[in-house]
């Protein structure tokens, strides 16, 4: 193969790879951005040693994505304090870099995050942090959804969960359940699902903490 041919092949590969990277970047949805940031926050804190550089990068990603508060009504399970647990919020994650005692005032950060942004904004990712006791199940109701919604959950470090999801139409009262596979029933650190309906509906999410310790969980909706 001549040098000229090799050069042409190299140029073609360069533009092909660049094009693929551009397509991938363009297809990253706001939901995926927030979902992945929550996962990376846990990765940065895994093993008990926080990576300051990673945490700052995650904090910036969440700040730029600007998720708004997710309106959630807890209908089953104990309502626990977030004290001592991870809050999936850019200010809390940034504070983790320099302040090891930040977990003691986790509830304060969670409350402030729920006041940030306009809850009525359309086409925005919604995010909240919830607690589930070890081995217990909490059920949450997310109202006023329409069309196709993407829902995700990310457990804090060293936690796993299973979940059940169903939608209930406001007008027809019809229910649709989204089945979990075996791996989900045994417990996973994160999970996502798409749900849809031809009418306005609410989403019922039941999260079972499969861990032996209480845990915080990010609930994400888009």
List each language-model region with its residue ranges.
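Boundary at the C-terminal end of the N-terminal hydrophobic targeting segment
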Residues: 23-27
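C-terminal edge strands of extracellular/lumenal beta-sandwich accessory domains
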Residues: 105-121, 201-222
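Charged, low-complexity interaction regions
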Residues: 44-54, 67-74
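Non-catalytic extracellular/lumenal accessory regions of secreted precursors
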Residues: 64-141
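Bacterial N-terminal signal peptides
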Residues: 9-19
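Start-of-domain marker
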Residues: 29-51
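Positively charged n-region of N-terminal signal peptides that target proteins for export
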Residues: 1-8
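Acidic, Ser/Thr/Pro-rich low-complexity intrinsically disordered segments
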Residues: 32, 130-214
